[in-house]
């Protein structure tokens, strides 16, 4: 039986997380994680000490037609930045965890929009 694309993506994500956990400096940085489905896009901020989600945004919150495109993914960045400001996390340094996805399309658009807001990763 042939293994699926998601199986390999998850295996890649596990390898990336293992490298992050082995580096002492990266253990103390907040992590911005993403998940994308065919219809929606999700972004989370993880606490480095408890490894729990602090806040999240998704295209489920917005009520515009099709939400699985580049425009809607990049429009989530200002929403996430507003939530960072509420939690006084805008001056922290972050790790961008792409979740095993390739850095193009929606992932790249979201990351560039976050960088435009002033988030450092």
Swiss-Prot record:
Gene Ontology terms describing biological process: translation
UniProt KW RNA-binding keyword: yes
InterPro entries, sorted: Ribosomal_uL18_bac-type, Ribosomal_uL18_bac/euk
Molecular function as annotated in GO: rRNA binding; structural constituent of ribosome
Superkingdom of this protein's organism: Bacteria
One cellular component (GO) term of this entry: ribosome
Pfam families: Ribosomal_L18p (PF00861)
Protein keywords: Ribonucleoprotein, Ribosomal protein, RNA-binding, rRNA-binding
Job of this protein: This is one of the proteins that bind and probably mediate the attachment of the 5S RNA into the large ribosomal subunit, where it forms part of the central protuberance.
Quaternary data: Part of the 50S ribosomal subunit; part of the 5S rRNA/L5/L18/L25 subcomplex. Contacts the 5S and 23S rRNAs.
Family of this protein: Belongs to the universal ribosomal protein uL18 family.
The protein, known as: Large ribosomal subunit protein uL18
Organism encoding this protein: Mesomycoplasma hyopneumoniae (strain J / ATCC 25934 / NCTC 10110)
Phylogenetic placement of the source organism: Bacteria, Bacillati, Mycoplasmatota, Mycoplasmoidales, Metamycoplasmataceae
């Amino acid at each position: 039986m042939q293994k699926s694309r998601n199986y390999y993506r998850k295996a890649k994500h596990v390898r990336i997380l293992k490298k992050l956990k082995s580096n002492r400096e990266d253990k103390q940085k907040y992590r911005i994680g993403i998940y994308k489905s065919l219809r929606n896009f999700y972004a989370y901020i993880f606490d480095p000490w408890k490894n729990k989600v602090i806040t999240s945004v998704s295209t489920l919150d917005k009520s515009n037609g099709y939400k699985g495109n580049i425009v809607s993914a990049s429009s989530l960045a200002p929403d996430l930045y507003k939530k960072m400001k509420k939690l006084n996390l805008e001056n922290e340094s972050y790790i961008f965890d792409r979740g095993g996805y390739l850095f193009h399309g929606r992932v790249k658009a979201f990351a560039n929009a976050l960088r435009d807001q002033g988030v450092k990763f």
